[in-house]
Amino acid sequence: MSAKRILMITGDFTEDYEAMVPFQALMAVGHQVDAVCPDKKAGDSVATAIHDFEGDQTYTEKPGHRFALTATFADIDPANYDALVIPGGRAPEYLRLNAAVLAMVNHFFEHDKPVAAVCHGAQLLAAAGVLKGKQCSAYPACQPEVELAGGQFADIEVTDAVTDGNLVTAPAWPAHPAWLAQFMTLLNR
């Protein structure tokens, strides 16, 4: 396996596990991961939220940790990266309004580079217009957005993931083992 440069686009109130776990896991196997957020610099941090599934009609939300950013968003050239990771949580709700973020997402699809999105990360994919004809899993409340963007919503178990071409998606953090394994396969192709 050759080490890859992976970009993680995140923001305030990203889901704690969905940022921290892949960030650390991908580095643990030798990849370089740069975590960025618009209007923030390397050394800044984003607030995270812990989403849990406790038997209510939707997930619960609790304060998470501070997640340190490792690169400056304004300095990023997506051409210098081999893959993209988009954690879920609240951040994709507002990141999808940022034209520079959408342009970065589009770069990875235009160049057929591996992309992973978890949970509400599908909102960013839908806004970028990259889901047409693709299977995409996400938190179930994102199904209308996936379908309105021309994607095929993959209604899978919360512990599963789906790969369609260069895209790996999962409904939420319980699917980390599944989506990380599928993403690693794409990284090694």
Where are these regions (language model features)?
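Extended, subdomain-level signal for the structured scaffold at the beginning of enzyme domains
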Residues: 1-111, 124-135, 143-189
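Short, thiol/selenol-centered motifs that function as redox-active sites or metal-ligating centers
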Residues: 118-121
